[in-house]
Amino acid sequence: GVVTLNLSELQPDAAIWCTYKYLNGGPGSVAAMYLHPRWHDLPPGLAGWFGADKSRQFRMEHELVPAIGAGRLQLGTPHVLSLAALRGSLQLIEAAGVERIRQKSLQLTARLRQLLHEHLPDAGFVCATPEADHRRGGHLAIRHPLARQLSLMLRSRGFVPDFREPDLLRIAPSPLYSRFSDCDDLVVEIGRILAAGVEAVDRAQSLVT
């Protein structure tokens, strides 16, 4: 969804990924799997009815005839509403092209890094994400002693970063709909929060935001 990846060239035995982040499937969206053709006859370790050969799935035979490929590892019926949302997102991604999405993603994260450096040089931020494009994914991980407080306060102002222990603020602009002006607005809001004073946060609350 945000990094170009050619599994046919990489030739892994298998690959598993989520669809709720940069594929925009949302919380609870289905997982996905690639299985190399050399393993298409692999017996499923845990068999489910949805892993049966789709042409004979409703014959209700007592002997399971697995589907060909990764489909044989499916267990039950996937969540249809999640699939509907994911289908709409995948159509947009296909129309835009992953290469173009990747380029915009790199530009968005580079802009965020530049804005933080230019506008908040003495605020104590240290970017933990590599600067080189080929080593960077789709988000910036920024170290700051008040990262958790900043995450919570930004959420209350309409921005949705997240926090990871001990001091990481993660910012992930989605290239399909995030604008470069959104990066500007975020950094301005961070500056306002720091200027006003960061509120204390109860450490007994959840440590993930």
Task: Give the location of each predicted region.
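Active-site C-terminal subdomain of aminotransferase-like
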Residues: 24-28, 34-104, 110, 209
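Active-site core of PLP-dependent enzymes with the aminotransferase class I/II
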Residues: 1-6, 34, 179-182
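Conserved small-domain helix->loop->beta segment predominantly found in fold-type I
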Residues: 69-76, 93-143
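Conserved PLP phosphate-binding loop immediately N-terminal to the Schiff-base lysine helix
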Residues: 1-24
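PLP-dependent class I/II
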Residues: 19, 52-65, 69-74, 129-134, ...
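Short, charged, surface-exposed secondary-structure boundary motifs
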Residues: 3, 24-30, 173
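PLP-dependent enzyme catalytic core of the Aspartate aminotransferase-like
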Residues: 148, 153-209
